Amino acid sequence: MTGDGLDWAMISVPVDLPEVIDRISYQRVVENAGATWDYFPGHFDPKYAQAQGNPTIYVNTMHLAGFADRVATDWAGPRSRVVHRSMRLAAPVYAGDTMIGRGRAVAKRRDTSVEPPRCLVDVEIRVINQHGALCCPVELTLQVPGSSGDG
């Protein structure tokens, strides 16, 4: 790894990614919903969330997607980018919870269908809460730089 992040040739799979921990405050849940223009009341109105059967407000889908992306790109470095993401919402992450992201790079490949070819790494991420409950399984693909300048 250089200061610019990982180079595709340097990556051996499978490899575990460093764990990322994020404590979710009430304020962040509300701010994130507003910043992403997601005005569904379950993200900012505790009475509405409770009427749905939740103990309090909960993070939105974009918050979870951004967190999963962070798990992958913090590992791969600033020259990496997410080119594909598939995720499933399994359980809510509530205000006051701690999100824990655990990832694993499981495959790497070169996409020669484009010019220049893209260097890709497939990553599986599990977003869990502080109780160990699976909140969001994620599969994503990163494009990373190649040693020959392609990527």
What are these regions (language model features)?
Residues 36-37, 49, 84, 101, ...:
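Short, charged/polar low-complexity linear motifs in solvent-exposed/disordered segments
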